[in-house]
Amino acid sequence: NTALFDVRLTVPSDFVVVATGEELSARKTLPGMMERHFVSGPVRDFVLVIDDDFQSDSLPVGGTTVRSWFNPGSANGGMNVMLWGAQSLTVFNRLFGPYPYTELDLVQVDLGNGAAGVEFPQILFIGGDHYAADAYTRRIPDFLEFVVAHEVAHQWWYGLVGNNQYLHAFLDEGLTNYVATVYFEEEYGAERYAYQANLNFKLPYLAMLFAGEGDAIVDQPTDSFPSQNVYGTMVYAKAALGFAAIRSVVGDPAFFSGLEAYADAFAFSFAIATPDDLRHALEQASGQDLTELWNHWFEAAEGLQDFSPDDLTQLRRDLGD
């Protein structure tokens, strides 16, 4: 659900505070201390990051300031994150309807448990380890840019449109992962889109299908998946392939107008979006019954109907895996 937040906190005067909403005032209280006052519009969470040595830079996108916050020594990565955040916001504003807030902050944060990014309203945590061009990011081209696009897309799918992330995780994570590749398509062209889709969706799904734990249903509660690996592959990769298949069937105008209508219907709403809501929005936009296609990708484990082991072999060859 959405809420309005009115938050006051007292911190050392030289600390930087990055928070959901907008800062209304900052006033001195005790020696060396400041009271900071933040208020938000309708958002689903309130989060803040406090640091004593953040640096920042920003770019305007329409009526929004996109600001990157980074640690000393990470200026290169921080500037790239700012640029990619602005580019992603521009693309998604056009495709899904305008981002409604005046600020979007991308913050370098040390994350654990394998996370590269975490979404919050108006604030995106970006894994600090990936700001440097280390061996991992060199091995996976465009990795950090993909993470940024994914997290920016969450401002629509989780931020504006709320869903039950436990029961139907694919509604935000799968859709967000798919439209992150659409960002590459819009910004760089069809070849980069295909590469990102093959690397991030098709390869992990086919590897699980033919060299891992097999297929599974996408739309099930998070703790019903047999392992974290199966959860990640189904919710982030197979679900994204499902949205790509739907787009292929209904065509771009219907697909993107359906997503925009879905976002508009649930923006700031106390209603929680369900899989049926998204399917109906795409059906209304396209004039097609998508029940069979939807069930095939999200409610069944029928991947062997679509792919063979030879597809995995060829894909690995193509990607140089």
Model-derived segments and their meaning:
Residues 109-111, 138-143, 215, 221-231, ...:
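Active-site-adjacent structural elements in folded domains
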Residues 3, 77, 81-88, 140, ...:
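Stable alpha-helical elements in mature extracytoplasmic
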